[in-house]
């Protein structure tokens, strides 16, 4: 992914986030910026609204959050980004990836906790 972004840096204008699970390292998440620089961490944030929520994420992210707490955290993050950034989307699409399954959830703007 890094090489694809780097080799197409003149025609791509997006950062990428790639996440998944495998039996060797477990959960992993990577961010690849617009020139192909890759970072790995506990979470990744990208897009025009990310500048508005990075501080909130740094202050409130807890690696030991329950699934319910993590979903509320994400809902607040995305709501804050949309509230401050007119270019951030009008809905949320959450995906929970585990060893056993992939669960998808769609949340319309009307259900955002912060508007």
Regions found by a protein language model. Name each.
Residues 1-115:
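Long, low-complexity N-terminal extensions
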């Amino acid at each position: 992914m890094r090489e694809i972004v780097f080799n197409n840096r003149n025609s791509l204008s997006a950062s990428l986030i790639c996440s998944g699970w495998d039996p060797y390292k477990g959960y992993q998440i990577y961010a690849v910026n617009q020139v192909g620089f890759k970072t790995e961490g506990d979470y990744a944030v990208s897009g025009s609204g990310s500048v508005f929520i990075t501080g909130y994420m740094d202050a409130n992210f807890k690696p030991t959050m329950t699934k319910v707490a993590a979903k509320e955290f994400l809902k607040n993050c995305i709501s804050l980004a949309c509230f401050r950034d007119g270019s951030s989307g009008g809905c949320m699409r959450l995906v929970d990836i585990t060893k056993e399954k992939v669960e998808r959830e769609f949340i319309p703007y009307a259900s955002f906790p912060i508007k």
